[in-house]
């Protein structure tokens, strides 16, 4: 089995990744279940985002784990479009790098998102990176004060910060989207194979490597990881952890 916990549909700069593109990738690679959010959300186009997720649901059925991407502007009222839809959401997502002055760990906006995650009983995915606004360690207090919520640190960056968070917060996971193989293996060897989720950010890599075949890219990274860890750890990362996180 293979579960990809970090995939995108929608508009990304000059590229548009349609629901059909995502389904084609999933079938060609052999992804059994996939957690998908829409990058069209960057344009605050709620109607389009819902349309994309609905179309994906029609194409993938129960294979789809819909991720609700929440923006600060959306919290002011438009989030009702998502909450009142007939979509059974599997995960929430926020992107502090895109809204540097809004997603403060102790702020009211994060508190509201936490309340939604708690009400829906689903995990919260947070984009992390090397910038101060979204470092993994920035959210330790948030995770510690909400032990009943499962947090996914997308990308798990900076790497040293992510390891520190995993060591201090039992409700924290990281995903491997845009994470190099060496860092993935180090997480496993450090004893956190049960807290790493397979995620690829597909089809975003095609923006940075437009000439590369994405199916080959995907299969190559998956094969390299499989060769680098035990079969038990490989299965833990590629589907067993996700089954726990998404309550499958």
Indicate residue ranges for each PLM-predicted region.
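Acidic-and-aromatic substrate-binding clefts and catalytic sites of carbohydrate-active enzymes
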Residues: 11-17, 40-48, 70-78, 99-106, ...
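Divalent metal-dependent hydrolysis catalytic cores, especially in the metallo-beta-lactamase
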Residues: 5-8, 14, 20-44, 63-71, ...
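Catalytic pocket-lining loop regions of alpha/beta-barrel enzymes
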Residues: 104-198
